[in-house]
UniProtKB/Swiss-Prot annotation:
Annotated EC: 3.4.11.21
Lineage: superkingdom: Eukaryota
Organism annotation: Caenorhabditis elegans
Name of the coding gene: dnpp-1
Name of protein: Aspartyl aminopeptidase
Cofactor note: Binds 2 Zn(2+) ions per subunit.
Positions of substrate binding: 166, 299, 343, 346, 371, 378
Names of required cofactors: Zn(2+)
One of the record's GO molecular function terms: zinc ion binding
Amino acid sequence: MAAALKPSAPEIRKAAQEFINYLNKAVTPFHATQEVKDRLLQAGFTELPESGHWDIQPTSKYFVTKNRSAILAFAVGGSYKPGSGFSIVVGHTDSPCLRVKPISHQKSDKFLQVGVSTYGGGIWRTWFDRDLSVAGLVIVKNGEKLQHKLIDVKKPVLFIPNLAIHLETDRTTFKPNTETELRPILETFAAAGINAPQKPESTGFADPRNITNNHHPQFLGLIAKEAGCQPEDIVDLDLYLYDTNKAAIVGMEDEFISGARLDNQVGTYTAISGLLESLTGESFKNDPQIRIAACFDNEEVGSDSAMGASSSFTEFVLRRLSAGGSTTAFEEAIGKSMLISADQAHATHPNYSAKHEENHRPAFHGGVVVKVNVNQRYATTSTTHAALKQVAFEAQVPLQVVVVRNDSPCGSTVGPILATKLGLQTVDVGCPQLAMHSIREFADTSSIYQATTLYSTFYERLSTVLSNMQ
């Protein structure tokens, strides 16, 4: 039972290590989505085209992607009929990071540099003095066709050095200018052969597909090599910087996870793992619900995109799953449904104890955290909290509760967005962590097992729990 397991238990260690194996590959939303897709295919899921016809059958398993950076997987219960409900767990694939600008070539004092944009609310000071690599999606032309290529350089190729303290006028604070001081070094003029003869620019029609003048040739050549093409074949790119220092299990008792992108690859991974685990028993054959795990992009910047939680993508999918019933089958299904928004939660920081509300202090190994905010920054209600408590009791997974101080700002999640857009009963939860939005975050090993077990039981038991609520 999850509640009785110590951090050293084999089940805890195994789940944490499997998550780390995933995390070290999921270096961008594109890579995370591909990793999830591979897991689903191995588990017997069928990919559905968003633009094609769907023929949904009971006890079958499917998934659909959006922009290659968001994915929605669903397993149709054996007793499902249009108008039955949805059991949904939602995470997101993105994290605060630096992303390469469309025109990235920069240089200063005999260094070639790469221009980057800040994505989300990162702790940007933590990106200094790190061995950075680059990964993402590259679109190349092949005759009249455009092909998508997923690339990961893996090797450290970029570096943002700190200014020596001897040159600082203010040695007590560090607030870098994110436009002028957050510019990664690529290489020196000397190494680049900057004085070598340059190819003359064409004076004819400028092919808009050719981006060779937008980036340093050395940088674009590196990307082209990874994509298996020539630099002039690259039409566009969507590249992310990341720390090459891999995630790991750390601590004297091996009880912690240290790594990048815990917010929110933990939510994405455990949502999918919970779904897959729920399908191994007999409950799926008799379940009237459709079990759904959704992983959206762009949560860190407000979710307002085609692949974000604010789009109509989720509604369109749910409506298609309700097709074939009465004209109000979709609306009927919403009333029989519940959604868990799985996004990381703040553990109580031992060095900043006063930042946390005195009676709501999530701890490592203390269980999945339920987020409550009366101003609707989180979507949890007493009804959804009670339903989750019943699920947690049956799963034997401990729960914690977090409320922010009245004099403190509060973050938010996709929970209120989807609750508002779809009218879904929603509960906001997350696994406790420290250093949220740093380039390297810190969590406990127990969370992966606890969250996976909770979500698996949620999928298996939700229809019964809801039917027993009066």
